[in-house]
């Protein structure tokens, strides 16, 4: 069952969507307690105007899920920075249609709101124990009344400022045994005992105390708490999903003016055009992992016939749009996987630039890229390849670990928004090297656009010069030359540990003994 998730600032939520949210809430939130003074046992309803009030603050955010063009779940949150402390991510409302519960819709919405590990606090007010367990799982911390009590006054002030159903007179009771707030919202608790039984185990007891009708738990976790360690199952899931996570991350790179490394398309195209045996109007070019097509478009502009391949449809769409705008009939793009695509023809020159090789932590997958590159080369044709420089990465590194023996150290790595915003993934504050495998780990935050916010663990492979030369030879390439370079200055060979030497550039020729001959 496919769901589409989106994310909007509160001020940008259209009235039509608010109407749908009101209908969903009024039909799905629950029923008033039989002891309620008004409408006992009746469905709890909420007018659009009340939802608008929750969306008024500048810090309000909406995460919602669509299925078959209908909204089936949403979460409203406040994300605001408290001076001297940091961001608080507070979910103020969560509703999921009963037909879509137990299908990870609510979990996906909540995890998106609580995903950023560098926030000061995360939480919600709720009478649902499952929501509290979701908070604990998302933030890798336990809800502990004793810890909440240390900051409950700060949280109260935050709520009075941002949450319309909390005011100066709202009663909040927090002690070592419980944390709760009287929201005077008497929803029926008939299913609460069985829910509490379901979430309580000897190893993970319920710590938040009992709950009376009209009250909700005041549930929060905090940055300075001890983290729940990575389980073997979580590590296996992380490794197995690494390729898909990386694909998501690349799709969310803004590739705008702040990505300075991507602004050298024209000068790099001139370098390519000057390579031995390469000439516009004669040389056919394949650009594997073309991204938004900056090299393909610049080469097309000076007369080359170019085909660009990338597995990200959103980047290919951007490339096609630029090519069409420039009327470049000699440039085409296709959304396909560089490891598998077979274009049914061979080229005079194949490009594979800016770390397409190295995208995968599993070296076997990178070898598939090189093998397919060779497959698409004419006999004696040439290739230009670049990968990230492991020696510079190691020289700069401040953080290292072993996933095999100390995986929890990865939890302490600081996240950054570099991949989305600048593309600078050589900042040593934000990467960690596995000493056993030399795989590089980063936590990357993505928040631009309408997709749900995400903090992803990204893995990549970087190379020493002799290693990537050896991989090229094994694939069926003769290495004509290789050098350490920086973006836009490929004609200038650098030392292996020079601060600018982030890339290794290789000019290769298809070997006569290539296995693809």
Where in the sequence are the language-model features?
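SAM-dependent methyltransferase
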Residues: 384-471
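A short glycine-rich, Lys/Arg-flanked "PGG" loop and its adjoining helix->strand segment in the class I
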Residues: 367-379
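Terminal substrate-recognition subdomain of acyl/acetyltransferases
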Residues: 1-18, 22-33, 115-249
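Class I SAM-dependent methyltransferase SAM/SAH-binding core
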Residues: 296-340
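A conserved beta-strand-loop-helix scaffold within acyl/acetyltransferase catalytic domains
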Residues: 25-92
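Conserved class I S-adenosyl-L-methionine
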Residues: 244, 249-281, 294
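A short acidic, Gly/Pro-enriched loop at the edge of an enzyme's catalytic core
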Residues: 342-349
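Conserved acetyl-CoA-binding loop-helix of GNAT-fold acetyltransferases
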Residues: 96, 102-114
């Amino acid at each position: 069952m496919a769901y589409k998730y989106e994310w909007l600032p509160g001020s940008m939520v259209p009235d039509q969507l608010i109407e749908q949210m009101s209908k969903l809430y009024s039909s799905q939130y629950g029923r008033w307690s039989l002891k309620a003074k008004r409408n006992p046992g009746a469905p709890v309803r909420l007018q659009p105007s009340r939802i608008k009030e929750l969306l008024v603050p500048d810090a309000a955010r909406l995460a919602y899920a669509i299925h078959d063009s209908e909204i089936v779940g949403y979460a409203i949150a406040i994300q605001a920075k408290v001076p001297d402390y940091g961001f608080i991510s507070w979910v103020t409302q969560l509703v999921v249609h009963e037909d879509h519960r137990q299908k990870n819709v609510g979990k996906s919405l909540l995890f998106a709101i609580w995903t950023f590990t560098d926030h000061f606090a995360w939480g919600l007010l709720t009478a649902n124990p499952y929501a509290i367990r979701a908070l604990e799982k998302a933030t890798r911390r336990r809800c502990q009344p004793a810890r909440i009590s240390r900051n409950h006054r700060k949280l109260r002030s935050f709520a009075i400022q941002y949450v319309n159903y909390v005011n100066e007179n709202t009663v909040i009771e927090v002690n070592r045994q419980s944390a709760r707030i009287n929201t005077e919202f008497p929803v029926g608790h008939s299913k609460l005992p069985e829910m509490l039984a379901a979430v309580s185990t000897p190893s993970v007891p319920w710590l938040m105390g009992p709950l009376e009708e009209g009250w909700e738990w005041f549930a929060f976790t905090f940055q300075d708490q001890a983290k729940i360690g990575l389980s073997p199952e979580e590590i296996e899931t992380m490794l197995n999903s690494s390729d898909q996570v990386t694909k998501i991350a690349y799709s969310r790179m803004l590739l705008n003016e702040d990505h300075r490394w991507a602004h050298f398309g024209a000068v790099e195209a001139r370098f390519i055009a000057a390579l031995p045996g390469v000439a516009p109007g004669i040389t056919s070019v394949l650009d594997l992992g073309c991204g938004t097509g900056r090299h393909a478009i610049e080469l097309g502009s000076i007369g080359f016939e170019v085909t660009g391949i990338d597995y990200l449809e959103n980047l290919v769409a951007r490339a096609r749009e630029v090519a069409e705008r420039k009327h470049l009939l000699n440039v085409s793009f296709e959304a396909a996987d560089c490891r598998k695509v077979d274009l049914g023809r061979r080229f005079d020159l194949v490009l594979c630039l800016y770390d397409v090789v190295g995208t995968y932590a599993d070296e076997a997958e990178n070898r598939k890229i090189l093998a397919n590159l060779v497959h698409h080369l004419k006999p004696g044709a040439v290739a230009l390849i670049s990968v990230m420089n492991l020696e510079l990465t190691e020289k700069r590194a401040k953080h290292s670990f072993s996933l095999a023996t100390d995986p929890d150290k990865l939890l302490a790595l600081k996240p950054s928004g570099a991949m989305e915003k600048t593309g600078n993934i050589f900042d040593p504050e934000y990467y960690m090297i596995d000493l056993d495998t030399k795989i590089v780990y980063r936590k990357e935050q993505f928040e631009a656009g309408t997709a749900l916010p995400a903090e992803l663990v990204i893995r990549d492979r970087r190379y020493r010069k002799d290693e990537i030369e050896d991989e090229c030879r094994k694939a069926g390439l003769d290495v004509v030359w290789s050098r350490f370079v920086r973006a836009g200055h490929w004609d200038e060979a650098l030392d292996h540990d020079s601060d600018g030497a982030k890339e290794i550039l290789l000019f290769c020729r298809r070997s006569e003994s290539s296995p693809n001959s």
